[in-house]
Regions:
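Short, flexible loop segments at the rims of nucleotide/cofactor-binding pockets, characterized by
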Residues: 20-26, 94-99, 130-132
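Helix-to-loop junction immediately C-terminal to a conserved catalytic motif
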Residues: 12-13, 17-49
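Soluble or luminal CAZymes and related metallo-dependent hydrolases
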Residues: 10, 14-15, 98-103, 136
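Short amphipathic alpha-helical face segments that pack within enzyme cores
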Residues: 23, 54-57, 139-143
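Glycine-rich, highly charged phosphate/nucleotide-binding loops
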Residues: 26-31, 98-106
Length: 207
């Protein structure tokens, strides 16, 4: 049985505020590179998974760009340990049981509501930001397969650079996936290309 997402009237607003606060406190600057054209659709945010910060960064993007009700998939063991995330939009996945099918169905159901966004890390684990050969797990394809309603798929690449600052600068590269094909190979290839483009663009910055 999966733990479904909740949005507590105290914890959820605090988490939204805290995400912005802690990011500003621990970074020298924050830049969002790219555009998001709101099509009034549910949003699936596909992000690289490079650190403990990723969930806070995605919330920052949601607050400043997407403006949806925040949902994210989290390992059941971790969600039970850090229970408060369940009240900020977190829902559980357990890859070792049949409940993973229920989680994928639940995720797909969330993406029928235009007020919702769902964050997923298709890598399935934290990896180095220098790894540009990202392998997606098959759950992503199952979520999008045969959906009757349209979904706006948005790519997010999180990168950091210090330059001459003691604190890192955070750079969020975003782009909508518009190729149309929701098969795993197409999405993975397009995301990998976008990741490489983002790194190339990052190399032109000096602060």
């Amino acid at each position: 049985m999966i733990l479904k997402a909740k949005h507590n009237f105290i914890i959820y607003p605090f988490f939204k505020w805290y995400a912005g606060f802690i990011i500003r406190r621990h970074s020298s600057n924050v830049k969002i590179i790219g555009e998001f054209k709101d099509r009034n659709l549910p949003v699936l945010l596909i992000s690289n998974h490079i650190s403990w910060w990723d969930g806070f960064w995605a919330m920052y993007i949601n607050q400043n760009v997407l403006h949806r009700k925040f949902h994210f998939m989290m390992l059941e063991e971790q969600l039970r340990k850090y229970w408060f995330f369940n009240f900020t939009g977190g829902f559980s996945v357990n890859k070792s049981t049949k409940s993973i099918v229920d989680t994928l169905i639940y995720t797909s159901d969330l993406l029928t509501d235009k007020e919702n966004m769902v964050l997923i890390f298709p890598q399935g684990e934290i990896q180095s930001l220098h790894n540009q050969s990202i392998q997606f797990e098959r759950g992503l394809e199952r979520i999008l397969r045969n959906k009757e309603n349209a979904v706006q798929v948005v790519f997010l690449v999180n990168l950091i650079d210090y330059f001459s600052n003691p604190k890192p600068g955070i750079y969020f590269h975003i782009r909508e996936y518009t190729e149309g094909a929701f098969d795993l190979k197409s999405i993975q290839q397009n995301y990998t290309e976008f990741y490489a483009d983002s790194v190339g663009k990052q190399m032109t910055f000096n602060q």
